[in-house]
Structure formats: C-alpha cells, structure tokens
Amino acid sequence: MGVPFDYAPERPEHIDAILNGLDRYNPETTNIFQEYVTLQCEEKTYDCYANLALLKLYQFNPHLTKDETITNILVKSLTVFPSPDFSLALHLLPPHILTPISSSSALPAAGDAPLSEAVQKLAVLNTLLSSANYSQFWSTLDSDDLYADLIADVSGFEELIRIRIASTISQSVREIPSSELENWLGMNGEAFEKFIKEVCGWTIENGSVIVPLNKENEAKGTVVRENVKMEQFSRVIRRAYEQPA
C-alpha cells in the first residue's frame, strides 16, 4: 500500500488537529498555516496537504493572502518533483495570476504583477524539471536575480533539487559520463565528487558514474501469462456467428 496523500511524518499535532477538523476552513487558522510554511522552509520538511489547505483559505479569503507565502509553497513543491504538487498548488491560485501579463486582457490588480511574474518564472522551472531538462534548469535558475530572491527562504533548495534529480536518474541508468551528470546536477569538481559518493552512495570509475543496481534500473524481461478457459473462448466464437438483431 502506498503512502497516503495527506501523510506528513513531521507534521505537528496542532496542525494535524486543524486539518482533520472544521477549523481547516476557519480564516483564523491562516496565520498558523503561514507560520507552518515558514517552519517547513527552515527545517527542510514538507507538508503538501497543509500547504494546499492554506491556499484554499486564500481562495475564500483573498484579503488574507501573502505573496511570499504563496511563492514559498510553490518553491517547496519544486523540491519534491516529479510529484504533481506544483500543479496542484498552481490550480488553487487566481486565474489572472497565471495569465502572462503581456497577453492579459486587463491590467492586474494592485500588487498582483510581482506575484504573477514570480509564479510564471517558477512555472518555467517546474516545466524544465518535469521534462528532465536539468542542465537548462540550472542555467535558468542562475539567469535572473529574481530566482535567487524566490528560493532564498527555502533552506537547502539546491541540495534538495539535486537529490531529486539523482533519485530520478537512478531509476533509469546504470552508468553515466561524469561530465554529463555534472551538467545535470549543476556542480563540478570536489563538490560533485563529494555529492556522488557521500549523498548518493555511487562510485566514479574511468570518467563515469556507476549507479548501483536497483529494481528500477535493472533490465529484466517480463513474461505475462493469461489463462483463458475453453468456455470463454467458445463464447467468443459463438458470438461471431450470431446474426445481428
């Protein structure tokens, strides 16, 4: 059985009580959820269910919305790709925020333009990660100071992204050139070797990174066998000779 969608091992008891009661719809809990988002950013924890509950409160109470909290939730959701969390959060935001300013038929409300730009830039990062365009992800992240501002509150953002990239890679390859993996992880030299050996537990041999065998990257043929009873087969043949009504 898989892990439930609403499960978060580090979730405090008072947050769990709110999420499982009617108070999750109480606007007075907004500050509590916002503080919890800040805690997640500081302690490298993550609680998608609680974050989505906060965005839902913002939908019903727009006057309580905090732009910084929204962007922090989106940035945190990037650190758990390839899960759909970023898209789930994105679809709880007002439609005008998701529309490119240049193509919007109406001017954004006061204060919306900066948030709209930030959300759209984060959406670009999500697209690059989802499409496994990791080298372009790192170059895009370094291309604009706004990205640095957006990820500043999320402790260990780059390390968390690298761990997710490495996890995804380990599911599909057994060996990869070091130079290519350096581009995918956005690091090189001693830092790269340390990450590969100490964090990933992989080895480097003759200019290539060796990924240990696991159930995902093991090439194994699959034989599927189905048993069809004679009565089922005869029923198919009989229907072929039946006259249409």
Swiss-Prot record:
Keywords of this entry: Cytoplasm, Initiation factor, Protein biosynthesis
Keyword Transport annotated: no
Domain PCI: 46-227
Recorded superkingdom: Eukaryota
GO biological processes: formation of cytoplasmic translation initiation complex; regulation of translational initiation
Subcellular location: Cytoplasm
PROSITE patterns: PCI
Single GO MF annotation: translation initiation factor activity
Entry's Gene Ontology cellular component terms: eukaryotic 43S preinitiation complex; eukaryotic 48S preinitiation complex; eukaryotic translation initiation factor 3 complex
Subunit (UniProt): Component of the eukaryotic translation initiation factor 3 (eIF-3) complex.
Job description of the protein: Component of the eukaryotic translation initiation factor 3 (eIF-3) complex, which is involved in protein synthesis of a specialized repertoire of mRNAs and, together with other initiation factors, stimulates binding of mRNA and methionyl-tRNAi to the 40S ribosome. The eIF-3 complex specifically targets and initiates translation of a subset of mRNAs involved in cell proliferation.
HAMAP family found in the cross-reference section: eIF3k
Family recorded in the similarity comment: Belongs to the eIF-3 subunit K family.
Full protein name: Eukaryotic translation initiation factor 3 subunit K
Organism: Sclerotinia sclerotiorum (strain ATCC 18683 / 1980 / Ss-1)
Top-level taxonomy: Eukaryota, Fungi, Dikarya, Ascomycota, Pezizomycotina
